[in-house]
Amino acid sequence: MRGNDASRLPLRGVRALELAEIWAGPFCGSLLGDLGAEVIKVESIQRVARGAVNPGPGAAGYAGGEPGERPWNRFANFNALSRNKLGVTLDLTSPQGVRVFAELANLSDVVFTNYAFGVMESFGLGYEALKRIKPDLVVVFMPGYGNTGPYKRYRSMGMTIDAITGHSALRGYPDLDLSSLTMVHHPDAVGGITAVVAVCTALYQRARTGRGAFIDISQAEAFMPHMGEIFLEHSMTGQDSERRGNRHPSMSPHGCYPCLGEDRWVTIAVRTDEEWQALREVTGMAADSRFSTAESRLAHEDELDALVAAWTSSLDRHEATRKLQARGIPAAPVLDCGPDTYDDPHLQERGYFEEVTHPDAGTHVLSGPIWRLAGVEGPVQRPAPCLGEHNRHVLRDILGMPESAMSRLEEQDIIGTVPLQGSDMGGVRRVARQGRARTKTRARASSPQPPRRG
């Protein structure tokens, strides 16, 4: 731990069961793991949410575009969001799988899920059932729209939450329609962090009162405070906010400006008249009555942006940033999510990125913890689990299950390490369409078991 004591992480000794997929729920689990919790990710071989089970060569999301022999263990999004977790498989549609989960829940502190409303109840594992198993459990259900209300049964993804919260209508440039949205959906990340805060608060309450908690999180509602000023503006004026692109309602200049090189940019935000004066001095811009006040700068943004762009276009993006920051003007280069960020000297010096070796995916650089606790910072302790990798560790060492019982569960496909045919999301249709259907026997014969780690 770079000389730090992992035992001092604040959630050391807390066990959390994760039933989650895609981004929001798994992000919550990875953050809890970063804080020291023992996170056990519960999956199944009947329905695998790790990308496609049988992707073709060149499929996105795999290192080098190569899915490999066990693609379910190589999917980048899953591996990035599943660090510091143990992985087990349980068929929760079977009574045996539910019984095993109940035993685990009885020895755990937290159960959290971002499954759609009603899924946990369909397993017989709704909150009331979990509360009967262990009254002081902290339980988090975080579907897209919460656990009450007319939308509670609606299915959701990041894009739909982005849309229903009003965020989609605010993003982008005024001259582009709403179909021009990006594929970066902030609600997922916000939902994950919100769940972590809720879990930590509930654990604190439990330590004081001995009581567990049921936490109902609507990912949409967790995200809506990010547009608080927009809602306030509407309540005061009755008018809808317009899409502004990179511009700001009270700051100018405020935007993204071209620099030397192909597709190189710098962002600049001028908040005050003092910063405006500093910008004039840095750029050598002549005094102009059109820009003398914040109001006049906003009234002449097109002309002002052209002057700023004329200055930035002669400079490297990092040089422009240094010149502006030296005068206290908020500025930053636009970096790509690749070599630019990996090689960024600031992130390198802080040790943000960490090299992690995964038995099936190989060695890759992952983002590190998003917070640092003095003296107890926790880097990645283990890579993402292979499918069912810790079945025996969890069932034998935590639950005390004998080998004969675990073998029976394997024979009945309650647990396993290889997906059943058609087990990915939409997998039956995908396999049939691509003509690469494999039987369970063939898949097991051709796919060696992933190595177990202690």
Give names to the regions the model predicted.
Residues 325-381, 429-433:
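A glycine-rich dinucleotide-binding beta-alpha-beta segment and adjacent secondary-structure elements
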Residues 1-208, 386, 392-454:
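N-terminal helix-loop segment corresponding to the beta1-alpha1 unit
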Residues 192-213, 225, 229-237, 280-286:
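Oxidoreductase and adenylate-handling cofactor-binding alpha/beta cores
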Residues 179-190, 214, 244-245, 252-254, ...:
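A short glycine-threonine-serine/GTX helix/turn-capping micro-motif
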Residues 147, 176-185, 207-223, 243-247, ...:
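Conserved Rossmann-fold dehydrogenase catalytic segment
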Residues 69-70, 78, 241-249, 256, ...:
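Short Gly/Pro-enriched turn/cap motifs at secondary-structure boundaries
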Residues 253-331:
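Aromatic-enriched alpha-helical interface/lid elements that frame and gate functional surfaces
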Residues 46, 145-146, 219-224, 261, ...:
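Glycine-rich beta-alpha junction loops
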